[in-house]
Amino acid sequence: MNFQGLVLTDNCKNQWVVGPLIGKGGFGSIYTTNDNNYVVKIEPKANGSLFTEQAFYTRVLKPSVIEEWKKSHNIKHVGLITCKAFGLYKSINVEYRFLVINRLGADLDAVIRANNNRLPKRSVMLIGIEILNTIQFMHEQGYSHGDIKASNIVLDQIDKNKLYLVDYGLVSKFMSNGEHVPFIRNPNKMDNGTLEFTPIDSHKGYVVSRRGDLETLGYCMIRWLGGILPWTKISETKNCALVSATKQKYVNNTATLLMTSLQYAPRELLQYITMVNSLTYFEEPNYDEFRHILMQGVYY
């Protein structure tokens, strides 16, 4: 359905005139609105993923909570956007859910493609630190992102040095009332996420915990440096079992993974991925140590 020209009424009774379609993904279509600072994200209500996003926005992404966390952690920027409004729209046969969210700029995937599919190591390390800061905030609220990738990392419209991790349709609550979810497989959750970057736990049907997001970020940084992961081509065939088995093969062979992917083994990624692979499912990472490792790649 083309929503352009429709007037949507949100939960606060404000109206939004839907403009042209500017993006489409697995978790909804994105349209401009009559306010250039915002876009509207729409999908059928029955799909459920936009409800997951809405719940995450309303429960976790409160500006006051983010600001307080930044001050307490002495971190200048947390790359998470907030939700302006939400609502439902009913057509003749289908009911739709919509969110009104901040309008951002180009995504990192477009930037990488415009740079011959690779970025300088310094840039990759800086991006890695920004995403690490962002997922640390999420993790300390008890949530994992579950789908970190370049197309889900978006530049600010004005300040191109600010990045935002978007698309919260696969967020998982791994902590509740201070208790970690148990290490129990759910066959319905197997292989969630983007196959090339899906963490091994997710392949097996476990809820993505902190180590899963960090694992995915490691795969992403290899790709942003211009590497081709050993399972990149396999993932295009949608052979989930073979992708999972190939990832598992490299868990204790980080140097081989890097040499196979990049033809060299950056010290920072060797240390980062090795440390990720040493984490248990329940363990809280030492984010400062991970930041320190990546920061070395910024200056050396």
From Swiss-Prot:
GO annotation, cellular component aspect: host cell cytoplasm; virion component
Class in the EC hierarchy, top level: transferase
Record note on modification: Autophosphorylated.
Induction note: Expressed in the early phase of the viral replicative cycle.
Record SUPFAM superfamilies: Protein kinase-like (PK-like) (SSF56112)
Catalytic activity, EC: 2.7.11.1
Annotated binding of ATP, by residue: 22-30, 45
Subcellular location per the Swiss-Prot or TrEMBL entry: Virion; Host cytoplasm
Listed InterPro entries: CK1_Ser-Thr_kinase, Kinase-like_dom_sf, Prot_kinase_dom, Ser/Thr_kinase_AS
Keywords: ATP-binding, Early protein, Host cytoplasm, Kinase, Magnesium, Nucleotide-binding, Phosphoprotein, Serine/threonine-protein kinase, Transferase, Viral release from host cell, Virion
Active site (catalytic residues): 147 (proton acceptor)
Catalytic reaction(s) noted: L-seryl-[protein] + ATP = O-phospho-L-seryl-[protein] + ADP + H(+); L-threonyl-[protein] + ATP = O-phospho-L-threonyl-[protein] + ADP + H(+)
GO BP annotations listed: virion assembly
Keyword rRNA-binding: no
Chief place where the protein resides: virion
Tree of life domain: Viruses
Protein kinase domain ranges (all copies): 16-282
Required co-factors: Mg(2+)
Job of this protein: Essential serine/threonine-protein kinase that plays different role in the viral life cycle. Phosphorylates the host small ribosomal protein RACK1 thereby customizing the ribosomes to a state optimal for viral mRNAs (which contain poly-A leaders) but not for host mRNAs. Facilitates viral DNA replication by inhibiting host BANF1, a cellular host defense responsive to foreign DNA. Phosphorylates host BANF1 on serine and threonine residues; this leads to BANF1 relocalization to the cytoplasm, loss of dimerization and impaired DNA binding activity.
Complex formation: Interacts with host JIP1; this interaction increases the amount of MAPK bound to JIP1 and subsequently increases the activity of transcription factors, such as JUN, that respond to these complexes. Interacts with protein OPG198; this interaction inhibits the repressive activity of OPG198 pseudokinase on viral replication factory formation.
Family: Belongs to the protein kinase superfamily. Ser/Thr protein kinase family. Poxviruses subfamily.
Protein name as annotated: B1 kinase
Provenance organism: Vaccinia virus (strain Western Reserve)
